[in-house]
Amino acid sequence: MIPYRQLVRMSHLAARFVGGADVHVVDPLVDLRNVFEQTDQLKIALECRNLTVDVEKVKNEYDEWFETYQKWKQADKESISQLKKELRAKKDGLLNALALPNLVHHAGKKQTPLLKPSKHAQYLAQQGLMRIDKQNHVVHLVGYPVVVQKMIREQLVDLFPGCQPISPSYFARAAILEALNIDQSTCIPFTDDSSHFPLTYLVGNSLPAITSPFLKTSFGEKNEWPISVQCTGASYTEKKNQVDLGNARQRMKHCALWMSKSAEELEGIINDANVRVGAYLDEGLDLEVKVREVRGSELKNYESQAFVVENRGLSLSRISRIGDYVSKRLNIQYSGSPATEKSEKSDGFVQMVYVETDIDRILARLVDDLIEGKEPPKYIRDAIKKSF
């Protein structure tokens, strides 16, 4: 059975049907019958992620909830109150179903390469270019690393000229994290210490941040497709054991999101992103990188497929195929032409691809190369000279 902690997490996403004090933020698609029509694929998605779930029990509980939901939608004033109580009594049926991960489009078979330890932290600290705040698990840079960091940020933005720059909020409600099926224990909770403040997290530039502006959005026919946006800046996670550029709780990242009307179009977007990011890191920064399709056990709950661009076992960039898993939960749709005698109505939930590149990890590997005697590209050397 799905762990209870996951059921509790989904209560914010399904606040409308659960009751209690949770804030109603999101209206996810609750007709999940098509998920259970693909039982074999669902079992594969669970097994490859090492999740033990009684699929039949989840399905039966959900069917009972959905049957009550359909009655509630059509109920008259006399019976609607009683049916609402029944919905809340059977809420586990919905919460269990919402806790299920995305189906798997394709998974790789290559083992995760051995991670080569980085020496950048000790080197930069000795040079007086980095200070490690062990209490808050963050690092502070000065001097040329800041120049290189800024340069990489600008170049990554230029790498995707078709992506519209946005400045999303650094905060996300619990319902947004649940819609993405992200483990909240990896995020930093935020509060103003008032009793009525809703459960909120500091996420910075991330998938929750870049998708939140489109919550409950319906794109019209006049939009140019695919719709693509990007943002860059600090990203935040909970504390880790190691504090350096690769593991600090505050790291500089570049994020890009594509939304398409066609699942078939995602393949081209993914291939293009793999080529652009891989070529930039390899040819632009002279880093030895390899693109690897991740195994099923490495997939995040919202991913159906993912590729990582790695340098000596360290992931520098991740390209995620999401499909319509997130858009159905955040209610992000597109509307098109109405139905005619010759064609069906053209509307649905958008298909997504998400690319996240860790700028601080790139900087760490550039410093590692420098320690080993490898010179950085000339334009980086020139930029460093100008900064002095």
Predicted features and spans:
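N-terminal alpha-helical targeting/anchoring segments
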Residues: 2-131
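TRNA-recognition modules of translation machinery and tRNA-sensing kinases, especially anticodon-binding
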Residues: 34, 64-67, 110, 115-388
